[in-house]
Amino acid sequence: MNYIQTKCLFLYKFQALKTILSNEQLQLTIQRLSHQLIENHFPFTDTVFIGLQPRGVFLADRIVAAIQAIYPEKKLEYGVLDITFYRDDVHKELHVANQTTIKFNIENKNVVLIDDVLYTGRTIRAGMDALLDFGRAAKVELCVLIDRRF
């Protein structure tokens, strides 16, 4: 394979990334998700928010910050959950574990799991398995930025 064939193969395999949401659309979506959580869970007495490592944490940080900006007097319980060793593909390749930080009790609480994308549900299943190590929640809800469907 010469240089031209190699270059074409490289360009074929690695296409330019497509922008799904602009910065403005992303901010609007985060505000919309935050307001939906306020509508469903206010005054947050029995609700906790948990961002799934690694990419769900970025979304969770923004959602929790947006809610705190609207209700600065409310103390939201927010944690971060690493699901690395709960995944069904953990033995297939090397995975680096991230930190789990849950400094509150989830027993009989409404848990909102926050992640970036829902596709097959494997990440969410792993998150729910990992969550069981912290107690039995009354209810678990999912908040995602993008639902890829099928």
Q: Language-model features: where?
A:
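PRPP-associated nucleotide enzymes
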Residues: 1-150
